[in-house]
Every structure is written in C-alpha cells, then in structure tokens.
Amino acid sequence: MELAEIVMNPVRQRIFQYFLLHETGTVKEIRKALPDIPGASLYRHIKILADSSILMVVDENRIRGTVESVYQIK
C-alpha cells in the first residue's frame, strides 16, 4: 500500500489527528476519543499505520495477562 493511500483513508486521518493532539495513546484511549469507530476497525487501521512505520510502539503495559501497546507517531 502506498503512503498516500494509507494516509488518505478518513479513519486513519482521524487516528492521526488524535496523535497530533495527544503525544501517545493506547487503543483503549483512542476508542474513548473516537467512539463512532468500531473496535475491530480501529485495531485494523492502527495495525496498518504501525506496519507502515507511521506509528510506533513506545511502551507496553501488562494488564491481566495481555499486553496493551502504547503508540506514538514516528
């Protein structure tokens, strides 16, 4: 996927705007800020942004046996 195609998606633009206002964020925090985006879609779009090196994981929190990633714009 080309960079222009990645960043022109409306959902990914909203996620990107979230990170312009907040230095870091978890999926849970982003879901709270963007409640109209379904959770599965949010996870998929964050994965696309992370795989394309637009977002990076800056920390990981262990919560009840699972790992919650903290993301930041690269």
Question: What residue ranges belong to the model's regions?
Answer:
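Short, cationic-aromatic polyanion-contact patches
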Residues: E5-V11, T26, M56, E60-K74
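Pre-recognition alpha-helix immediately N-terminal to the DNA-recognition helix
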Residues: Q13-Q17
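A short acidic, leucine-rich amphipathic alpha-helix
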Residues: E29-A33
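Short, hydrophobic-biased segments on the C-terminal half of alpha helices
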Residues: I46-K47
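Glycine-centered, phosphate/nucleic-acid-interacting loop/turn motifs that mediate DNA/RNA or nucleotide
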Residues: S53
